[in-house]
Amino acid sequence: HNLPAAAPYSGEEGWKELCRRDDIDLVYICTPWQLHVPMAVYAMEHGKHVAVEVPAAMSLDECWQLVDTAEKTQRHCMMLENCVYDFFELTTLNMAQHGLFGEILHTEGSYIHNLEPYWDYYQGNWRLDFNQSHRGDVYATHGLGPACQLLDIHRGDKMNYLVAMDTKSVNGLKLAKEKMGAETFANADQTLTLIKTERGRTILLEHNVYTPRPYSRMYQLTGTEGFANKYPVEGYAFRPEQIAGEEIPDHENLSEHSFIPQAAKAALMERYKHPIARDIEEKARRVGGHGGMDFIMDYRLVYCLQHGLPLDQDVYDAAEWSCIGSLTSASLEHNSMPVAVPDFTRGDWDKVDGFRHAMAQ
């Protein structure tokens, strides 16, 4: 491609030199979690837009640092939440925006992923070390991001408060003893969070990276007119009269109260395939990156920057989705007491009418 060789930067302070360059527009941060905010803030203060891996921030104070710096510098700060770009999520979001599910009342999301084969890949045990000292849902964004887009969070609704519960730590503690010699482990084997929104909807989150449960981000929505579910089985359900040719189920046969047939599902997904997926799906699947969603995420980031459009994920998304770790910890430490979710928009949560992907005219 006749591109110049990449310029290497190393050492504890090398990244600052990169941020100070005047020929860079965007700084892309993929480091251990604790470095996300210092690097993002420094980059924005030096005139750079920022794309930062998940979670973007690890404390409430860090969430506010990102918001305040982005507002002060007028730089974009996008958290790299890739799961909002998976194909089922994009299509289901498009269906929701066309009203197929009626009013969405409840959503579910999770990060259930047995990391037992992967812990050694985290240099210096940085991820396990963080979990060892932090209780709560420390990795909520993969499940929460798609849920928030469905519910138009800070675009017509907002998260008001949450409560969290967790199990004791068994596998996590055993793992930490083996790898770090730790005698205590704060992060539970299973953590659950319930969130209530201003408009009376709910979100359920789960976190579990220690037990042999099959991988799941749950991704589920319950609406007044329909239902969608991704894990463990993709499917949709609607009122019988919404689907042409469907008979009313026999109430004595519970197996008939089920998903629409596969042929109807396939036709529905093709009809409501998201315009972004329709445009770029083939190339995204060919290039790959978690099945193509990483490619779509980067494509959308560059597309919006090049066309001067609002990013799909703004700094308020980054703060809202990342603050769950701190808030669930506070709830758990006070016997699952409700904890308020900050309004990072400072009152502007209903100024935008619904979530939409910005497109150039």
Model-derived regions, located:
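N-terminal Rossmann-like dinucleotide-binding module
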Residues: 1-3
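A structured beta-alpha segment of the ubiquitous adenosine-cofactor-binding alpha/beta core
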Residues: 6-26
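Beta-strand-loop-alpha-helix segment that lines the small-molecule cofactor/substrate pocket
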Residues: 25-26, 32-33, 37-85, 99
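Short, well-ordered coil/turn residues at beta-beta hairpins
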Residues: 30-31, 194-197, 206, 211, ...
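Predominantly a Rossmann-like dinucleotide-binding segment in NAD(P)-dependent oxidoreductases
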Residues: 73-78, 83-185, 301
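A short catalytic or substrate-binding loop motif that flags glycine-/basic-rich loops and adjacent residues
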Residues: 141, 184-189, 197-198, 212-213
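C-terminal helical cap and adjacent loop that interface with cofactors, partners, or active-site loops
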Residues: 148, 214-222, 229-230, 240-361
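Glycine-rich phosphate/pyrophosphate-binding beta-alpha loops
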Residues: 189, 205-215, 289-290
